[in-house]
Amino acid sequence: MNNLYLGVDIGSVSINIVAIDEENELVFKLYTRNSGNPIELVKEGLAKLREEIELENYKISGVGVTGSGRQLIAYVLGADTVKNEITAHARASTYYHPEAGTIFEIGGQDSKLIIVEDGIAVDFAMNTVCAAGTGSFLDHQAERLGVPIEEFGGLALEADRDVRIAGRCTVFAESDMISKQQYGFTKPEIINGLSEALVRNYMNNLVRNRVLEGEYIFQGGVAANIGIKAAFEEEIGAEVIVPEHHDVMGAIGIAMLAKRDVKRSGQESSFRGFDLTEQEFETTSFECEDCANNCEVIKVIADSKVIAVTGDRCGKWTASLIGDSAANANVEGSSEKEEKTAAKSSKKQDEDLNKNSEELEANLYKVDLEKEKQVMKELEELEKSDENKKEDNSLV
């Protein structure tokens, strides 16, 4: 029986599911829009996986989950590895392109810059505040212009003139595009101007004064837009590589990491199995008022049983899964054995998430302490200078 490893990337706009074998060959790939119910979409994705491959010849030996919605889906699937998108994207990029030094990643709602040295992510930047330049913004503009999103990038290359579009804000960008339309500029010229503006915005907000080296990799859903790719190449003066599976690189990376972690541990996968496609899942929440934190505690319920509790900073409600009816209030039929199993899984996921956060901070953030001390020193000198001025003025 052959081993398969699942990778699931839960984004705000898309949900990606892949399966790789022992040689990291892609056996299954699914890219689907997130319509607002990630649990149901993941269940549908697993059902498609079961339909497309002969499961009697394969065994799911590891499951990894990444993306902004990773916590909930990790509990639902029984994931072995849960990591942030930066780590997952860097893993896949450096596997396919060992010389990768700079990774541009633009998704549906955010954009990322990842700096890689010797196959390891050493620095990164994310823009989660402004939607300008993200996939959802481009979708909206394509719809407004009456252009299929698949043709959006190609039209940019047909522009005869350069048109400057404001790209720092979605509101200003759209207003400027409308203004340029009224002045008679063509759709290709406006789309090309928008592409260049969004790349300028990316460079100003994320790259800033960072030194970009190595191969330049462009991934995420927006990487399919050849207009944006061309704008990046013009901006940096170098070739930009778009991987074959640019749209699911996060899922591929987390699948690879899950395979690594399972082999290191020597334990069986925690995957709940394909039967979960037949289960009904429900999420409920309440505000804990036992301390000043007022945590929003989220419970995940499957077939009338609490399988996970998250959101409590102190771990009180997570721990209450073991032999305590508090977590299972309003839930009937939870056996002690099942509660202990769920609590163990929930605790493991929380530990993994905390560990991942610590690793991210330790490995990706390089805090220049000497510079910080210098800034503090300058502030102290400035304060002393102000005090001396006040004293001099009082003597006059």
Predicted stretch roles:
Residues 2-23, 100-116, 291, 296-300:
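Gly/Thr-rich phosphate-binding beta-strand-loop-beta motif of the actin/hexokinase/Hsp70
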Residues 175-204:
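Adenine-nucleotide phosphate-binding core of ATP-dependent small-molecule kinases
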Residues 35-39, 118-161, 169, 260, ...:
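Glycine-rich phosphate-binding loop plus the immediately following alpha-helix
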Residues 66-69, 197, 208-235, 243-250:
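Glycine-rich phosphate-binding loops at beta-strand->alpha-helix junctions
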Residues 30-35, 53-86, 122-123:
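Short beta-strand-loop/turn "lid" adjacent to the catalytic site in phosphate-handling enzymes
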Residues 4-47, 124, 128-129:
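Short glycine-rich, Thr/Ser-proximal phosphate-binding strand/loop in the N-terminal lobe
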Residues 91, 135-139, 244-271:
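Glycine-rich phosphate-binding/hydrolytic loop that grips phosphoryl groups
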Residues 260-331, 335, 350-357:
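Acidic, glycine/GT-rich loop-and beta-edge segments that sit at the periphery of enzyme/chaperone cores
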